[in-house]
From Swiss-Prot:
PANTHER family: NUCLEOTIDE KINASE. Pathway: Purine metabolism; AMP biosynthesis via salvage pathway; AMP from ADP: step 1/1. Keywords: ATP-binding, Cytoplasm, Kinase, Nucleotide biosynthesis, Nucleotide-binding, Transferase. Belongs to the adenylate kinase family. It comes from Corynebacterium diphtheriae (strain ATCC 700971 / NCTC 13129 / Biotype gravis). Its main location: cytoplasm. This is Adenylate kinase. NCBIfam families: PRK00279.1-3 (NF001381), PRK14527.1 (NF011100), PRK14531.1 (NF011104). The keyword Cell wall biogenesis/degradation does not apply. One of its GO terms (cellular component) is cytoplasm. GO terms for molecular function: adenylate kinase activity; ATP binding. Catalyzes the reversible transfer of the terminal phosphate group between ATP and AMP. Plays an important role in cellular energy homeostasis and in adenine nucleotide metabolism. Pfam families: ADK (PF00406). It is an enzyme of class 2 (transferase).
Amino acid sequence: MRLVLLGPPGAGKGTQAAILSEKLRIPHISTGDLFRANIGEGTPLGKEAKSYIDAGKLVPTDVTARMVKARLQKDDAEVGFLLDGFPRTVEQAEILKEMLKGFGVELNGVINYEVAEDVVVERMLARGRADDNEDTIRTRLQVYRDETAPLIRHYGDDIITIKAEGSIEDINARTLGALGK
């Protein structure tokens, strides 16, 4: 199964991805993890990404896409994957589509975890991270909405919307049910 995971910060994508990865026996591929791994290993792509991150800039789409492509070419991703953090834009969605076409496959679906803003704020404040204050969280949510709304429209009928409120187990059951698992 080849899936993209969407949802605002604090929606529980990482938590659900870990459970789904184990249950579906497919890798969870997070762009954040890819950046950290490539930078940590000192790969050419990692060095390129680090130069942008160190300058406080976003890593360009082409660098991120090359990291994703390299990761998708590994053996464990042949049977499927959960992609988290890419695509973030319609342009990236088109790049992913072409990339997968080159592998002779396509996405099986796009899971969009929906959660009320107040629930996200509450969850993120409860994590106790230094950079998580209410104003910062609400700003991040607005940026997410602005970036992702066109992507959700782009995927249209391929979107599988999951209400990401309630227990971790309930959310996982809803996700697996929507996937027919």
